[in-house]
Amino acid sequence: MTGTARRVTNVRSAVFTFVALLIAIIAARADDGAIISRWYSALLVADRTELADLLADDVRIKLDDLGIVQSKQEFIAALDEWKGAVAGAAIRHRIAKSEGGVTTVIACYDFPDNDVLTRETFAVTDNHITASSQAAIAENCEGY
């Protein structure tokens, strides 16, 4: 094999490796997006089974505005109260960015009597949410 043929083969190999890596990254982000969509769908109806399936056993859910951090068990236990609060509500969300294994979401919670705009982050590993944080960024959803 000549030097030129070897260089072409090396370039093709590098391009193939780069494309394969890029496809894997895009697929992982798509999976994270699907998991986050499942999260909001389940959250809207307080679906304990789906939410428990989405959360890693050692997840930590940080609610900045309340100053608390919940375990998976604490979060699931609070769903009865949440179910009453979310009755008649709507949740809209959009992914703002995704980098370094963390996805940032802007979410609008349209409750019957008020609404709130939040910034939420999700760390996803092996199709489970391993960490989440939530902070209000506005008392209405005009910025959504």
Q: What is the meaning of each model-derived region?
A:
Residues 115-144:
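Short beta-strand edge/turn micro-motifs at domain boundaries
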Residues 60-69, 85:
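A short gly/proline-enriched turn/hairpin at secondary-structure junctions
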Residues 26-30:
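Sec/Tat signal peptide C-region and signal peptidase I cleavage site
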Residues 13-24:
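Bacterial N-terminal signal peptides
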Residues 47-58, 62:
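Short, well-ordered alpha-helical segments enriched in acidic and aromatic residues
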Residues 31-47:
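Short, aromatic-enriched amphipathic alpha-helices that serve as compact interaction elements
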Residues 73-119:
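Surface-exposed, charged secondary-structure patches
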Residues 1-11:
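N-terminal secretory signal peptides that target proteins for export/translocation
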